[in-house]
Amino acid sequence: MFKKKLFSIILTLALTACASATPPPTVAPASAAAPSGNLVIYSGRSEALIKPVIEKFKAKYPAVTVALKAGSNSELANALIEEKTNPQADVFVATELMTLQSLADRGVFEAHKSANLKDVSSQYQHPDGLWTGLTLRARVIMYNTDLVKADDAPKSIFDLANPKWKGQIAAAGSANGSLQAQVAEMRQLLGDEKAQKWLTDLKANDVKFFGGHTDVRKAVGAGEFKIGLVNHYYYHLQVAEKSKVAVIYPDQGKEELGLIVNATGAGVIKGAKNLNNAKAFVDYLLSAEGQEIFAQLNYEYPLRKDAPLHKDVAPLTNYRIAVFDVVKV
């Protein structure tokens, strides 16, 4: 089974609600012919978040027929490993980079260095082109303003363990890639003991763990819970539904952890039946147009330096960011 080190920490706390050598990559040239045929996408991202960019890709390349299989990162990673000798997917879109790195270590991905990577920080690229980051997400605390005053809202992720919030906090469970990435990053920055204590404290504080962040944001927006731990764009999606919610970008004090930010990403499947289409799709995700879709429709932070941020999203430069090695988490 596909597992990461942090699974043993999260799963034992019952938080959930429900290499072979790689050939040197070459920079992808512009294709002489427009993509056509089929494209099978496995996505650890929810259909609602990945479908807009797929629809734009299809509009750009109408000769391509796209099939999307959405699920959890771990489920799809297991499938990719099981299908390695007979790949059923052409490209995998993941909610975080740990899964991509683990699959790269297992020889699942084909090297592909998109020409668009020149506009993406090397921090979010595999050195051999086996995967690339796509967008960034900040881990934030959202709260219902009818139930929590701004001065009382938690300012740190560690405040979520305060007994005053017992039974009043919602979060995504252990199957969620963003939580997994956050815990892995905390382990790297703070050590196993402190990261595990944080998880234990959340459990002791009767945090309600949902299957995904959409359920979390809606529960907070409806006043079923006072506080939610989410990716920043879920706050903006809830604001768009006219809910009375506000957001804290946590741990900004001088001696505090800093804002945890993680990345989505994608990799082309080695031996894919529609290899050229898979590469064209990754190229599109990294294009100025693709990045703008993520930013403007999903409120995400684009990785391209020239892609505009949504006007309602605060720039990451406003915050002190927790610095970690995205590959080693």
Identify what each model region corresponds to:
Residues 1-38:
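Short, low-complexity disordered leader/linker segments with a strong preference
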Residues 35, 40-65, 81, 141, ...:
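Short, polar/charged alpha-helical segment
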Residues 43-51, 71-74, 87-225, 257:
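Extracytoplasmic ligand-binding site segments that recognize negatively charged/polar headgroups
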Residues 53, 194, 198, 231, ...:
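Short amphipathic alpha-helical coupling segments at ligand-binding clamshell hinges
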Residues 98-102, 221, 226-247, 298:
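A ligand-binding cleft/hinge motif common to bilobed small-molecule-binding domains
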Residues 142-147, 261-274, 293:
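A bilobed periplasmic-binding-protein/Venus flytrap-type ligand-binding module shared by bacterial periplasmic
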Residues 167-174, 284-305:
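Periplasmic-binding protein-like
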Residues 192-197, 302-329:
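An extracytoplasmic/periplasmic, membrane-proximal ligand-sensing/linker region
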